[in-house]
Amino acid sequence: MTNGNGAPPEAAQAPQLNVLAQYTKDLSFENPNAPASLAPQAQQPSINIQINVTANTLADSEFEVTLAIEGKADNAGSLIFSFELLYAGVFRILNVPKENLHPLVMIECPRLLFPFAREIIATAVRDGGFPPLMLDPVDFVGLYRQNMERQAAAAASADEAKPS
């Protein structure tokens, strides 16, 4: 038995995640102390990376997910380089229960975007005169949980601050 398009009925209800587009929204690389920053350093620089994920609903089943990655490298308080990347994708998600949709958008979609963003950053840092910066894999499940806990704590403190 089929559902009219040749597929069995259970296949019509299978969850689907499609990448419709991927693109760089913003890319910035700064090497403010060049050429001095390109000289061999006595010690390894300190590298600080911040990652954030945001999502916007475009249509009933389409979402734009943006992976924001910012980084700075400094040595003894002197900025060596900094970068900022906003890398986004448009995803179509079908046949996913509503309670699973938010985690899917905020975990799986950025996980699919990350390798591309990682390559863009490695190339930008290399083109800035430094060895490529290979970002470690990101635990998007842990990042999602941290953000949910932070939102819950903010909501709880907002409720406590309301006058009775």
Curated annotation (Swiss-Prot):
Q: Which GO terms describe its cellular component?
A: cytoplasm
Q: Where in the cell is it found?
A: Cytoplasm
The protein's UniProt keywords, in alphabetical order, are: Chaperone, Cytoplasm, Protein transport, Translocation, Transport
This entry's Gene Ontology molecular function terms read: unfolded protein binding
Taking the first listed entry, what is the main subcellular location of this protein, grouped into a coarse class? cytoplasm
Disulfide linkages recorded for this protein, renumbered to the chain, are none
Which SUPFAM superfamilies does the record match to this protein? SecB-like
Q: Name one GO biological process term.
A: protein transport
- Classification via Gene3D superfamilies: SecB-like
Annotated Pfam families: SecB (PF02556)
Q: What does this protein do?
A: One of the proteins required for the normal export of preproteins out of the cell cytoplasm. It is a molecular chaperone that binds to a subset of precursor proteins, maintaining them in a translocation-competent state. It also specifically binds to its receptor SecA.
Which NCBIfam families is this protein grouped with? PRK05751.1-3 (NF004392), secB (TIGR00809)
Q: What is this protein called?
A: Protein-export protein SecB
Q: What is the lineage of its organism?
A: Bacteria, Pseudomonadati, Pseudomonadota, Alphaproteobacteria, Hyphomicrobiales
Which gene is the coding source of this polypeptide chain? secB
